[in-house]
């Protein structure tokens, strides 16, 4: 546990960074498009059994399409491709990167952290720290706060924050569970 003098403690909204700036943003979209209609087809038997109307998923979630990685591609491939673009757009040498944070919740393994593989594939310097922050949608904001704080403290010069997701395994599991005759 760490402590700070009471007069130095603020709220999360009080954080101000004086030396950190966003240099680039890049993305890599998965090539496969999966529609809500596809899930309706996969769940047609369940919808019929439970007397649910087709199109329910899109009406409830408001999502008509999602993207997924093609056969043989992984979310980590997308992370690396986007990171390469971001480094190039920022105009810095990767040897200057002192921190890599992966803010994805997707992972193929419990350990090692996704950041370890990304660090290696990007050929970042050995002295660059790397770790994952998995806090769902807030993970990226948390990562920006940690990286900016380390820059302000003078611990690093540049940080690279990455995130890439692949909900396909969760989708397959959900369809399998929902198609179980015992599901209600």
Model regions and ranges:
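Short glycine-rich or small-residue beta-strand-to-loop segments that form or flank ligand, phosphate
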Residues: 99-105
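Conserved "HGTGT" condensation-loop signature of ketosynthase/thiolase-family condensing enzymes
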Residues: 1-98, 120-123
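Anionic group-transfer/hydrolysis microenvironments
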Residues: 26, 104, 165
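Acyl-thioester C-C bond-transforming condensing/cleaving domain
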Residues: 2-17, 48, 84, 88-94, ...
């Amino acid at each position: 546990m760490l402590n700070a003098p009471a007069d130095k403690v603020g709220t999360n909204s009080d954080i101000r960074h004086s030396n950190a700036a966003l240099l680039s943003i890049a993305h890599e979209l998965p090539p496969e498009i999966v529609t809500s209609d596809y899930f309706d087809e996969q769940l047609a038997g369940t919808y019929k059994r439970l007397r649910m109307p087709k199109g329910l998923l899109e009406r409830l979630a408001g999502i008509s399409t999602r993207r997924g990685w093609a056969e043989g591609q992984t979310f980590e491939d997308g992370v690396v491709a986007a990171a390469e673009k971001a480094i190039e757009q920022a105009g810095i040498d990767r040897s200057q990167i002192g921190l890599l944070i992966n803010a994805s919740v997707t992972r193929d393994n419990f350990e090692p952290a996704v950041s370890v593989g990304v660090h290696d594939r990007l050929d970042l310097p050995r002295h660059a720290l790397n770790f994952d922050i998995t806090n769902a949608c807030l993970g990226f904001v948390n990562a920006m706060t940690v990286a900016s704080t380390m820059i302000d403290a003078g611990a690093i010069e540049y940080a690279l924050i990455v995130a890439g997701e692949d909900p396909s395994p969760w989708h397959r599991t959900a369809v399998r569970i929902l198609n179980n005759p015992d599901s209600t």
